[in-house]
UniProtKB/Swiss-Prot annotation:
Coiled coil: none annotated. Its EC number is 2.1.1.177. GO terms for cellular component: cytoplasm. The keyword Repeat does not apply. Specifically methylates the pseudouridine at position 1915 (m3Psi1915) in 23S rRNA. HAMAP family: 23SrRNA_methyltr_H. S-adenosyl-L-methionine binds at residues 62, 94, 113-118. GO terms for molecular function: rRNA (pseudouridine-N3-)-methyltransferase activity. Keywords: Cytoplasm, Methyltransferase, rRNA processing, S-adenosyl-L-methionine, Transferase. This is Putative ribosomal RNA large subunit methyltransferase H. The gene is rlmH. The lineage of its organism: Archaea, Methanobacteriati, Methanobacteriota, Stenosarchaea group, Methanomicrobia.
Length: 145
């Protein structure tokens, strides 16, 4: 399975870069994952940039009004996509202004990481960690407690 994270904005701080690299390395045995960064501008222009980078398959938009899932539920959702033969999943992370309505309309699932608001850099790390956790749950490997 191929996964693509399409994120608005660039991670500039070294500690966020290190955390992202850490989880990207840990995810490599489970999935091909690439990250595309879209320039931060007004949400409509960001939306066009995001939509231009979709790689087919299922699209998940991270949105504060999206569906909440536990780690176990995310693992089950991901496992179902694998069983269905889904070739790719796009994960979209908006910038400070959120996602355009066009992007939300195009998404197959709107997912909320929490009721709390996080900086978009942290949202990327949280998503990577939850994807790693989901694969460990699916493979029944130790990590999730």
């Amino acid at each position: 399975m191929h996964m693509r994270i399409i994120a608005v904005g660039r991670i500039r701080e070294r500690f966020w870069q290190d955390a992202a690299s850490y989880y990207l390395r840990r995810l490599s045995p489970y999935t091909r994952l690439d990250v595309v960064e879209v320039r931060e501008e007004d949400p409509i222009k960001e939306g066009r940039g995001i939509l231009a980078h979709l790689c087919g398959g299922v699209t998940v938009a991270l949105d504060e009004h999206g569906e909440s899932m536990s780690s176990q539920e995310l693992a089950l959702w991901l496992q179902n996509r694998i069983v269905e033969g889904c070739g790719s999943i796009n994960w979209i992370i908006g910038g400070p202004e959120g996602l355009s309505q066009d992007v939300l309309n195009r998404s197959d699932l709107q997912l909320s990481l929490s009721k709390m608001t996080f900086p978009y850099q942290m949202a990327r790390i949280l998503l990577l960690e939850q994807l790693y956790r989901a694969f460990k749950i699916i493979k029944n490997e130790p990590y999730h407690r």
